[in-house]
């Protein structure tokens, strides 16, 4: 059978519906015929299930539509994994904006209206606006045409950690940290604030983020109060400090303990359920704090995810806008 290009779709005449849509979920019915998206037509040409499109075989068809190559690679891979795949065209799928394909659960087709994955195709050299993620799968195609799937979500970040007793401590601001000489033991043991300087009962050193939060909540007394600590933080980091402080405070308010994630290349590693430092488990998340409009390359996203996976943690981006609202986006590897 041969197709004909019309209004950006490939029309296949009589018997097209039965052969392509009814039996295998390709395209959308058009009477007894079927209308195929170009990527579907390319796949059928590659399989030999479609003879030509306006006389063109696969080579000529791809040459005529060069921007089709990368989506074709993803479509082919998903089809060969056993999925029915609908191109995300208006009128074909619901909520089509921002995606390229809807992947139906195995055993289902476009007539079922079910969704396993909403897929966006990204070239390795492209860019990803992080606040557009959260309900899509990124299908990243590298320069050797290998595929990496990254699943994104908007997680609920919360825990049960906190201080049960009202505590107070005095501190001294020294360069980029605060030192507490006689801090209550529970501040560290139960709240996991700071680090002991030299031994179990030694002075407690707090990061500027920890000190700013404790000063703002009335736990820590320091010359100049929270404002002095925050000013020192801005001197050291600029606006980045304010974003990180917003995320730090929010995590603490939600019962999550944030600690430095420096050795993992992140802003924080987090613990959701801290009862005591002596019984501390592994951290669950790596958190990078970025502006709300942050854009990263697929390579950078993949590196973050790979590192988090390698240390058995989940990668989360905390996107902070000018009003201190936070959008949480998690990204992880996916094998469809």
Curated annotation (Swiss-Prot):
NCBIfam families xref list: endA, PRK09300.1-1
GO MF annotations, alphabetized: lyase activity; nucleic acid binding; tRNA-intron endonuclease activity
InterPro entries named among the record's database cross-references: tRNA_endonuc-like_dom_sf, tRNA_intron_Endo_cat-like_sf, tRNA_intron_Endonuc_cat-like, tRNA_intron_Endonuc_N, tRNA_intron_Endonuc_N_sf, tRNA_splic, tRNA_splic_arch_long
Keywords associated with the record: Lyase, tRNA processing
GO biological process terms on file: tRNA-type intron splice site recognition and cleavage
Catalytic activity: pretRNA = a 3'-half-tRNA molecule with a 5'-OH end + a 5'-half-tRNA molecule with a 2',3'-cyclic phosphate end + an intron with a 2',3'-cyclic phosphate and a 5'-hydroxyl terminus
Listed SUPFAM superfamilies: tRNA-intron endonuclease catalytic domain-like, tRNA-intron endonuclease N-terminal domain-like
Active site: 271, 282, 313
UniProt name for this protein: tRNA-splicing endonuclease
Highest taxon listed in the record's lineage: Archaea
Group of enzyme by EC: lyase
Keyword Zinc: no
S-S bonds: none
Record EC number: 4.6.1.16
Protein family per UniProt: Belongs to the tRNA-intron endonuclease family. Archaeal long subfamily.
Subunit-structure text: Homodimer.
Protein task: Endonuclease that removes tRNA introns. Cleaves pre-tRNA at the 5'- and 3'-splice sites to release the intron. The products are an intron and two tRNA half-molecules bearing 2',3' cyclic phosphate and 5'-OH termini. Recognizes a pseudosymmetric substrate in which 2 bulged loops of 3 bases are separated by a stem of 4 bp.
């Amino acid at each position: 059978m041969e197709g004909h290009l019309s209004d950006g779709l490939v029309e296949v005449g009589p018997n097209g519906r039965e052969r392509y849509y009814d039996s295998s979920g390709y395209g959308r019915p058009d009477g007894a015929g079927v209308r195929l998206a170009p990527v579907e037509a390319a796949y059928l040409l590659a399989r030999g299930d479609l003879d030509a499109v306006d006389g063109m075989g696969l080579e000529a068809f791809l040459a005529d539509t060069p921007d089709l190559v990368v989506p074709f690679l993803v479509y082919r891979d998903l089809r060969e994994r056993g999925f029915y795949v609908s191109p995300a065209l208006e009128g074909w799928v619901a909520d089509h904006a921002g995606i390229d394909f809807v992947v139906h659960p195995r055993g289902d087709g476009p007539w079922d209206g079910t969704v396993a994955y909403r897929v966006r195709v990204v070239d390795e050299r492209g860019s990803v606006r992080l606040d557009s993620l959260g309900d899509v799968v990124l299908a990243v195609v590298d320069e050797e045409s290998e595929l990496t799937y990254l699943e994104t979500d908007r997680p609920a970040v919360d825990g049960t950690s906190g201080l049960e007793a009202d505590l107070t401590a005095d501190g001294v601001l020294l360069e980029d940290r605060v030192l507490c000489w006689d801090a209550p033991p529970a501040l560290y043991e139960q709240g996991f604030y700071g680090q002991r300087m030299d031994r179990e009962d030694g002075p407690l050193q707090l990061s500027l983020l920890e000190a700013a939060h404790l000063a703002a909540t009335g736990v820590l007394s320091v010359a100049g109060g929270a404002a002095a600590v925050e000013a020192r933080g801005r001197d050291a980091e600029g606006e980045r400090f304010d974003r990180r402080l917003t995320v730090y405070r929010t995590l603490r308010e939600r019962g999550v303990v944030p600690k430095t994630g420096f050795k993992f290349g992140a802003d924080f590693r987090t613990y959701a359920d801290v009862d005591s430092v002596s019984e501390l488990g592994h951290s669950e998340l790596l958190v990078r704090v970025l502006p709300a409009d942050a854009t990263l390359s697929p390579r950078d996203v993949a590196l973050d995810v790979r590192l988090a996976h390698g240390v058995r943690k989940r990668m989360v981006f905390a996107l902070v806008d000018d009003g201190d609202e936070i959008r949480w986006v998690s990204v992880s590897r996916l094998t469809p």
